Amino acid sequence: MTTVASLSLLPHLLIKPSFRCCSRKGVGRYGGIKVYAVLGDDGADYAKNNAWEALFHVDDPGPRVPIAKGKFLDVNQALEVVRFDIQYCDWRARQDLLTIMVLHNKVVEVLNPLAREFKSIGTLRKELAELQEELAKAHNQVHLSETRVSSALDKLAQMETLVNDRLLQDGGSSASTAECTSLAPSTSSASRVVNKKPPRRSLNVSGPVQPYNPSLKNFWYPVAFSSDLKDDTMVPIDCFEEQWVIFRGKDGRPGCVMNTCAHRACPLHLGSVNEGRIQCPYHGWEYSTDGKCEKMPSTKMLNVRIRSLPCFEQEGMVWIWPGNDPPKSTIPSLLPPSGFTIHAEIVMELPVEHGLLLDNLLDLAHAPFTHTSTFAKGWSVPSLVKFLTPSSGLQGYWDPYPIDMEFRPPCMVLSTIGISKPGKLEGKSTKQCSTHLHQLHICLPSSRNKTRLLYRMSLDFAPWIKHVPFMHILWSHFAEKVLNEDLRLVLGQQERMINGANVWNWPVSYDKLGIRYRLWRDAIERGVDRLPFSNQSESGS
């Protein structure tokens, strides 16, 4: 019989633990006190061979505080203090549960019809009175345990604040700090620390958006879906506050050139594609995919060239390298996992800085409050939301939601959502769900106040939906509706940020992935030799 099932058989009155125990020193893992027996009033050994005692036995961890080598405890030592507190609470809870079992056995014995035949009413009253006294003690013990748990939660909340502060101060470059972050538990008691003096914060995202650091350009950026680039079409894009246009050359391969004619600075995308060359609509000058002007009607041919960027196509996506000296390394795949079918590819131009949009996409805790008319309609508000991730990673999974998420530098967010029941996501992990939705968000930094968003949605079920007429219009409408729910908030953030407000003023546990993105970006802009959070953050990978 399981513990839960056993407890369900106990009278409600008895679930208030306490007992008198006789203990002797034993050799435990922590050198504490090992409980060997529980004695009744008559000295009978109830627990020496009791299955309950064997099940819930645990060493007393005892009060232990790590020795500080300096004037103050560092983060690791502080976490050790909390860990020992948690171990003691666990030991105390097991002892309380053992008390419940012992009292249960006593009640069964007192009320046993066979035993009552050999006892007088006075004896039964006396035994019941003694049990009532023990229950009163158990009631007091429960309150004491609740106080201990509350104190432990307060310490956990303070440790969370301490770890976040240390993580922000260290800039994410220290592996030990990152490890501390993964160990920092998240509790609903975080609000209890607001009356304490707030620690100094070093993650400051406030003020007008500054010009982009050139280091951010040294990555491959996906800028368009292949399906949007026909042989006779052009795709104008902005990237890092420069205007470019993408088109296919004579060989069918995509090219990216400056969207400005060398002659009179006319936008080239207003023209047309003629035999694999982009033609200016003003005077008909034509440029190849490498930027060379190959045709000048009505004048003598001159050696003219406009800027071009390295550009290639992979797995239905067009990529460019806006920085210097592109590497020869291959680009990781952005395709959905095996078994998924792509149902929608949508492009939007949004009036927000791309970092703020990434902050939003890397945060799921806002969903039941923000997306109440779309995908999160009907979601309950969990008592605790956590993002569980390796100490040095940019990926993990949300608890209690069945959602896996990854930030992939420089600007991609990939997520897999397990679908169990419509309108309900809690209760299962992603792997436990039989059907899934896979999402890819690409946030291309168009300018300091504009983002080009590429969105791809895939399903591992119902592939026939893709062939339903006008289904792409429905997907686009739904995606736009979801984004509008976010935009009204992110635009407000952006306005206040420009006026001096810090959009990362008080990070909490479920902000972990967003914090790591910001620390990664800060490291890129500072030009550190070793980027934080795994090898996938290497430039150009």
Curated annotation (Swiss-Prot):
Keyword Transmembrane (UniProt): no
Reactions listed under catalytic activity: chlorophyllide a + 2 NADPH + 2 O2 + 2 H(+) = chlorophyllide b + 2 NADP(+) + 3 H2O
Single GO MF descriptor: oxidoreductase activity
GO biological process, one term: chlorophyll biosynthetic process
Entry membrane topology: Peripheral membrane protein
Location(s), subcellular: Plastid, Chloroplast membrane; Plastid, Chloroplast thylakoid membrane
Notes on the domains: Consists of three domains A, B and C. The C-terminal C domain possesses catalytic function while the N-terminal A domain confers protein instability in response to chlorophyll b accumulation.
Name of this chain's protein: Chlorophyllide a oxygenase, chloroplastic
Gene: CAO
